[in-house]
């Protein structure tokens, strides 16, 4: 009897393992941005909470064709769902649509809110990027900025372009955006060159945390008196805000962007296609210094 019970338990364990859900997340990081490990951890934590397997992939080259191939490879492995950032719908849309047409549920996250439904995704989890940029620009204007510069480390990424365009919509004035790349040395060099070429620039928006840190160094090297604001959180950005080197950052809640798609897909797969009634906007939050610590305040939900 004991042997029979042991065999039954072993069979149940094998069956449970075979039935475990498996989700694949693919993002456009090149592995240098401190933003994305937080997203990945959110996905892994969600998968652990529901007992699912989780895979995380990215193309270190940052090439969109390479990312599309990763999506195709994930679809070929027949997972229970794919989670993907969508910085370039033209380059990635075909692979995402093919996965959806093959019956694999897809949720987009982070970038690609406007294109998510068109490429066949069930829904999107992420920040409304243009609105976030507008709020950053409006706050910079209220804090005295008159002539801005937006630093974009991924020229192909429509979400970052939306942030920059929104910034100048809120600030007023024509778009002044430069491609600084993801290389820290290039970010510093190009930012310093732009500030030296136009000393009237009194406001800089960095649309990524590592860009913000590099921009801060460039500003100090040039000796410019510039209002610096950022997107996203990192320990270095938090220290910069506390020290007064950055005015504020906009926290788009990247852990939520990694966590919620896994939960959404789990509910979809285990509850007869249940989905939230709308896309899930990750919170628009300002993080700025208070006398004792870093305070966080929610932005208004509309422009």
Could you tell me what each predicted segment is?
Residues 50-60, 150, 170-184:
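Short beta-strand elements in bilobed, periplasmic/extracellular small-molecule ligand-binding domains
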Residues 71-72, 80-101, 167, 176, ...:
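Hydrophobic alpha-helical
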Residues 286-293:
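Conserved small/polar residues in nucleotide/adenosyl-binding loops
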Residues 1-19:
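Gram-negative bacterial Sec-dependent N-terminal signal peptides
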Residues 34-49, 132-136, 158-174, 190, ...:
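Short, solvent-exposed amphipathic alpha-helices that sit
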Residues 89-131, 232-247:
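Flexible loop/hinge segments that line or gate small-molecule binding clefts
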Residues 67, 123-148, 187-188, 233-237, ...:
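Hydrophobic alpha-helical segments within soluble ligand-binding/sensing domains
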Residues 23-42, 46, 50, 55-71, ...:
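Extracytoplasmic "Venus flytrap"
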